[in-house]
Design a protein with these regions (language model features):
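Ordered alpha/beta subdomains of enzyme catalytic regions
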Residues: 1-116
Length: 116
């Protein structure tokens, strides 16, 4: 986390790992891909919102730096892995896969500040 992000997101600065700050569905899908042997295939994911904020009919794109930093630093800590194993029942092979996870990404994005 950058110093700037820590200033604007102080609650996140307390947490070494944001890997579990997701819907369990996403981790279940990772597990399914892993068990089917397709975890390393290319995949496409999107980040979006459902409605314009504040009901004003438009939005301004912001936050790309935050997304890039999150993805660059994404890792599962040992406490994350222990939680997933003990509470969600994932097997040791998947836990090891998460422990050694290295993302290979191409990010396509709107420009920061563009109106949506």
């Amino acid at each position: 986390m950058t110093e700037r992000e820590a200033m604007f997101y102080p609650e996140l600065a307390k947490d070494d790992s944001l890997a579990l700050h997701t819907d369990l569905y996403e981790i279940n899908m990772m597990y399914t891909y892993f068990k089917k042997g397709i975890a390393d295939r290319n995949a496409v994911f999107e980040s979006f919102y459902r409605r314009e904020p504040f009901g004003n009919g438009y939005a301004v794109y912001a936050g790309l730096e935050h997304i890039i930093n999150y993805l660059k630093n994404l890792k599962f800590t040992e406490s994350d892995l222990q939680y997933l194993k003990e509470n969600e029942g994932y097997d040791d092979d998947f836990i090891d896969y998460l422990r050694n996870l290295k993302l290979k990404l191409t990010i396509r994005s709107m420009k920061e500040g563009e109106q949506l």
